[in-house]
């Protein structure tokens, strides 16, 4: 996944292309939606 950032969050997340939700099994705890992609934290 490509790196991305969410407003107000330190570090970087994983950008998932053309997804509306973060995939399970990666330990993501938060996300921000960037249509049509989603940024999932933490990386």
Curated annotation (Swiss-Prot):
GO terms classed as biological process: regulation of blood pressure
Cellular component, GO, one term: nematocyst
Alphabetically ordered keywords of this record: Disulfide bond, Hypotensive agent, Ion channel impairing toxin, Nematocyst, Neurotoxin, Potassium channel impairing toxin, Secreted, Toxin, Voltage-gated potassium channel impairing toxin
Main location: secreted
InterPro entries: BDS_K_chnl_tox, Myo_ane_neurotoxin_sf
Residues in the signal sequence: none
Keyword Cytoplasm: no
Cystine pairings recorded for this chain: 4-39, 6-32, 22-40
Compartment(s): Secreted; Nematocyst
Gene Ontology molecular function terms on file: ion channel inhibitor activity; potassium channel regulator activity; toxin activity
Keyword Heme: no
Recorded family membership: Belongs to the sea anemone type 3 (BDS) potassium channel toxin family.
Role played: Blocks Kv3 voltage-gated potassium channels. Reduces blood pressure.
Protein name: Kappa-actitoxin-Avd4p
Organism of provenance: Anemonia viridis
Lineage: Eukaryota, Metazoa, Cnidaria, Anthozoa, Hexacorallia
């Amino acid at each position: 996944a490509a790196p991305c950032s969410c407003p107000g969050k330190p570090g970087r997340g994983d950008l998932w292309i053309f997804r509306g939700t973060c995939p399970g099994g990666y330990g993501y705890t938060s996300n921000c939606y960037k249509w049509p992609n989603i940024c999932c934290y933490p990386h």
